[in-house]
Amino acid sequence: RVIPLIIADEKLREAERIAGDTPILSLHPYVRKTAGVITTGSEVASGRIQDTFTPILQKKLAAYGIEMTEHRTVGDGLDAVASATAELRTKKLDMILCTGGMSVDPDDNTPGAIKQSGAHIVTYGAPVLPGAMFLLGYFDDGQPIMGLPGCVMYAKATIFDLILPRVTANVPVTKRDI
């Protein structure tokens, strides 16, 4: 890190030596993508409460040129969420996003359903607030799936907002990255 306006040449050379052949900066363009969203929760599926998450999520996606082309609303059951995931997998979407059911309550089955659907889980949990209950996984074909905690709806910037640009630029995200 260079604080002053000038730096000694030997310090700059040392930084170059440490970096080696690794580029200091690489740019990956955003790629237009499609997303499928699965809204989980019996209270939303039954119509008892209005889905206020999806409209906010659509705005966040649109900022990166991502179009939500599929949307399913299902109850809290493990099989219902896994079935909706399997259905969206047939739609050849660029990513699948699940909202609801991400905390530690007994009826929060979204993480288990994502795992049951065949995704390889990169992480369930992130050392970032807000967003500690974030889930990221990939299917064998490279399609990402994310479980989004409720904070994505309320907070301007969460772990999702840090990961989404990388996913949009086709940069794989590893557990080490998170």
Task: Describe each PLM feature range.
Residues R1-T69:
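Short, glycine/charged-enriched hinge/interface segments at domain edges or termini
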